[in-house]
UniProtKB/Swiss-Prot annotation:
Keywords: Aminopeptidase, Cell inner membrane, Cell membrane, Hydrolase, Membrane, Metal-binding, Metalloprotease, Protease, Zinc. Belongs to the peptidase M1 family. It holds the Pfam family Peptidase_M1. It is found in: Cell inner membrane. The record marks 382 as: Transition state stabilizer. InterPro entries: Aminopeptidase_N-like_N, Aminopeptidase_N-like_N_sf, PepN_Ig-like_sf, Peptidase_M1, Peptidase_M1_dom, Peptidase_M1_pepN, Peptidase_M1_pepN_C, Peptidase_M1_pepN_C_sf. GO terms for cellular component: plasma membrane. Its EC number is 3.4.11.2. This is Aminopeptidase N. SUPFAM superfamilies: Leukotriene A4 hydrolase N-terminal domain, Metalloproteases ('zincins'), catalytic domain. Aminopeptidase N is involved in the degradation of intracellular peptides generated by protein breakdown during normal growth as well as in response to nutrient starvation.
Length: 869
């Protein structure tokens, strides 16, 4: 196929805009009639034609100012109206279209989810409903009338406030909604269905009462309470921290089972993947609870950073997403453990985003070129985008950052803005030059800091030499110097933190790295210090400093920055694993350093000082986390070395793990920071003990005694990964209990996909026919196929190529039904350059097979083309 790219530099204001749109939906899963009456306003007096976006529906009729209109041309993607004889500055167009929601497997536009009907319009889904100027810089007021069978669809929901309703004689009913705030078409939403409803209210700081409504499938009401409490907590936090108050009279959330993304921030009517709404102790883990709280907050925070201030064009996506991810991370940090949240965010960034930076899909947080916009809802735009916002916060401080936020909101409320508008507001509010900092928006790749040091004993001077570079990426060969905030601390041999000073003046602990090579000098340092570099992960960069084992052991023991203590452990683990991978490749015996075992024993035996941090330090990095530290990934070597280290740590510290495991006792399940920390530590001890002779009996007992899903899944997970004798019995028991609950079965499918068995692929292929598996449900696909391709390093990358062929078969099938999900699942295949020549050949062969598929979607074409070029 020949897919046309769009470029950021080509942005032009529209010739026309939309001021108001009236939508009438006559809903039926097999035949929905949509009437759209749209008021247009001319912006360019020279324009003689109006091109409206639209596809995937049956076009019925068009009227211009109430009269039939025939001066138009259609193609597969648009409707172009000839207006050379129509000079009015304002006019009205009425378009009627027919849709079949039941057959829309792409889950974009209007589609059937279970027994209900809903929409997903971001980024370009509205054009699958009717013809429209489907671009984010066209903001209009919406009135929506929905008519449907009352028995089947008792709830009819859309954006804004309910203004009217009624019943018809034929058993149908209707509801009309008015959203007074102009919004782009991607924020339109509609839901029709039969739900259980949880109602609550929130009183804003100005005294307004907001009705809160949370809709879930019948029978799930007891799993909705946590989501509602999370929403109220987020609304209060946004008022307190950002001084932002909700603006409508009602806020609705609907949970649906068939959803491509996590959730969608449609104005006043959020539509959520049920995974991020439903929770009770029997069905959801601690991680599920925390994820729900975070995603609920993220979508709510979009009300201001995304909806009230939206994006001018999709190249500016990080304007709303990077900022809102930063805001939801801060919410989680303020309401939970800041250190735990920071460390978990960094783990994800280093494993997933750094890999994307090094892949054929490398792009800046503000991309320059796009074929399929859905492909740029990426960890770079979201998570790296959030890191760029965080660096601004580090440079400006909380007070300066909030000054910039207030100016940004004041200047852009009700508008479609750009990344430049945001940086400019920060700059002007703080009287600071951010010209060099702007390069973070336009430069792709992961910067690297090469750091060396020297100590002058005579003058008590310590020097850090910092060199920055960014390796060439697939989209950019030439790189420039960035403004990198490098947060540091210095410790003496006894663990005492040194004052940072130069010529008698105190220095900030944030060093501004702006040149290719810079030297930072510290005076009054008595004795060669141990440097703590990149405290709190102050910039999304890779660090190259030759840490000695004893330095890392020192930081692990006495650093007062929790991130640094954890990161020291990560570096110790990585050093040990790299040595063992070399031994594995050379056929030598594997071994583990006694110093590491001693250090881990110390952390374990003092865990009560900081339970959460101790657990994070003691957790062995996953295979994919280790893989990121290798230029060429050896799946077999990494898998063997990690398994050896896990077993050795378990055996060496068995008595300590057993003592802590036995000591921790919890009664009734509660989602509190303290209880979560204790459960995580206890289950970590269980994980290690599973690799000792105590494992089978202990894990089986843990599973049988569990009174919550966190403990149940911990036992089931380690039984599977350690291939214990009890594994099959426990897996069968879990399946029998939960086979009718798709979300819970997702956990089971994911465990099956990551089991270490040689025949795991055969097991997965059989599970594709499991009664609980549905190929058209993205959650099921991600749990089984996605878990295998992304988290079973050794099996997916088997040298036979069987894993690659399996994924290719799935992608060919998905290309027709849901190309957006296909484009997510293809990611492990396009990163072939990180592997050896044999595996590269097999992965390229799989991509070449995909490239010749008939009617290849733009979603897949873009990624395959970039990978193979």
């Amino acid at each position: 196929m020949l897919a046309k790219a769009k470029y950021r530099k080509d942005y032009k204001q529209p010739d026309f805009t939309v001021t108001d749109i009236y939508l009438d939906f006559q809903l039926d899963p097999k035949h929905t009639v949509v009437t759209a009456i749209t008021k247009f306003q001319r912006l360019n007096n020279e324009a003689t034609s109006l091109c409206l976006d639209g596809h995937s529906f049956q076009f019925s009729s068009i009227k211009f100012n109430g009269e039939p209109f025939s001066d138009y041309q259609q193609d597969g993607e648009s409707l172009t109206l000839d207006l050379k004889d129509k000079s009015a500055d304002e006019f009205e167009i009425e378009i009627v279209t027919f849709l079949v929601p039941a057959e829309n497997t792409s889950l974009q536009g209007l589609y059937q989810s279970g027994e209900g009907i809903c929409t997903q319009c971001e980024a370009e889904g509205f054009r699958q409903i009717t013809y429209m100027l489907d671009r984010p810089d066209v903001l209009a007021r919406y009135i929506t009338k929905i008519t449907a069978d009352k028995t089947k669809y008792p709830f009819l929901l859309s954006n804004g406030n309910r203004i009217a309703s009624g019943e018809l004689e034929d058993g149908r009913h209707w509801v009309e909604w008015n959203d007074p705030f102009p919004k782009p078409s991607y924020l339109f939403a509609l839901v029709a269905g039969d739900f259980d409803l949880l109602q609550d209210k929130f009183i804003t700081k100005s005294g307004r009462e907001v009705a809160l409504e949370l809709y879930v499938d019948r029978g799930n009401l007891n799993r909705a309470t946590w989501a509602m409490e999370s929403l109220k907590k987020a609304m209060k936090w946004d008022e307190d921290r950002f001084n932002l108050e909700y603006d409508l009279d009602i806020y609705m959330i609907v949970a649906v089972d068939f959803f491509n993304m996590g959730a969608m921030e449609n104005k006043g009517l959020n539509i959520f993947n049920s995974k991020f709404v439903l929770a009770n102790p029997q069905t959801a883990t601690d991680d599920d609870y925390l994820a729900i709280e975070s995603v609920i907050a993220h979508e709510y925070f979009h009300n201001w950073t995304g909806n009230r201030v939206t994006c001018r064009d999709w190249f500016q996506l990080s304007l709303k997403e990077g900022l809102t991810v930063f805001r939801d991370q801060e919410f989680s940090s303020d309401t939970g453990s800041r250190a735990v949240n920071r460390i978990n965010n960094v783990k994800f960034l280093r494993t997933v985003q750094f890999a994307e930076d090094a892949s054929p899909m490398s792009h800046p947080i503000r991309p320059e070129k796009v074929i399929e916009m859905n492909n740029f809802y990426t960890v770079t735009v979201y998570e790296k985008g959030a890191e760029v916002i965080r660096m601004l916060h580090t440079l400006l401080g909380e007070q300066g950052f909030q000054k910039g936020m207030q100016l940004y909101i004041a200047e852009n409320d009700g508008k479609a803005a750009t990344c430049e508008d945001f940086v400019s507001a920060m700059e002007r509010a703080n009287n600071l030059d951010l010209n060099q900092f702007r390069r973070w928006y336009s430069q792709s790749g992961t910067p690297e800091l090469l750091i060396s040091d020297a100590y002058d004993e005579k003058t008590h001077t310590y020097r850090l030499t910092v060199s920055q570079s960014t390796p060439p990426t697939a989209d950019q060969m030439e790189k420039v110097n960035l403004h990198i905030p490098l947060k540091v601390a210095l410790y003496d041999a006894n663990g005492t933190k040194q004052m940072l000073q130069h010529n008698g003046e105190l220095l900030s602990d944030v060093l501004n790295v702006t040149e290719k090579d810079q030297v930072f000098e510290f005076h009054g340092i008595y004795g060669r210090p141990i440097p703590a570099l990149l405290c709190d992960f102050s910039a999304p960069v890779k660090l190259d400093y030759d840490y000695k084992t004893e330095q890392l052991l020192g930081l692990l023991k006495f650093a007062d920055n929790q991130f640094i203590r954890w990161d020291a452990a990560q570096m110790l683990f990585a050093q040990e694993l790299r040595r063992n991978v070399v031994r594995f490749q050379q056929g030598e015996a594997l071994e583990i350093s006694p110093e590491i075992l001693t250090a881990l024993s110390y952390v374990l035996n003092h865990y009560e000082k900081d339970i959460e941090l101790a657990t994070l330090i003691l957790t062995l990095p996953k295979e994919m986390e280790f893989a990121e530290s290798f230029k060429t990934i050896d799946p077999d070597g990494i898998s063997a070395a990690r398994a050896f280290m896990q077993a050795q740590i378990a055996e060496s510290l068995k008595d300590d793990f057993l003592r802590v495991y036995t000591h921790i006792r919890l009664n009734d399940y509660q989602v509190t920071q303290q209880d979560i920390a204790l459960r995580v530590m206890r289950n970590l001890c269980l994980t290690y003990l599973a690799y000792t002779n105590l494992g089978n009996n202990l894990v089986q007992k843990h599973y049988n005694n569990a009174n919550n899903m966190t403990d149940t899944l911990a036992a089931l997970s380690v039984a599977t990964k350690a291939a214990l004798l009890c594994r099959d019995v426990l897996l069968a028991d879990f399946e029998q209990k939960w086979q009718h609950d798709g979300l819970v079965m997702d956990k089971w499918f994911a465990l099956q996909a990551t089991r270490p068995d040689d025949n795991v692929l055969e097991i997965i292929q059989l599970l594709m026919d499991h009664p609980s598996f549905n190929f058209n449900n993205p959650n099921r696909l991600r749990s089984l196929v996605g878990s295998f391709a992304n988290h079973n390093l050794k099996a997916f990358h088997n040298v036979s190529g069987s894993g690659y062929r399996f994924l290719t078969d799935v992608l060919i099938r998905l290309n027709e039904s849901n190309p957006q999900v296909a484009a997510r699942l293809i990611e492990p295949l396009i990163r072939f350059s990180r592997f050896d020549a044999q595996r590269q050949t097999l992965m390229k062969r799989a991509l070449e097979r995909l490239s010749v598929v008939e009617n290849l979607s733009k979603d897949l074409f873009e990624k395959i083309e970039k990978a193979l070029q």
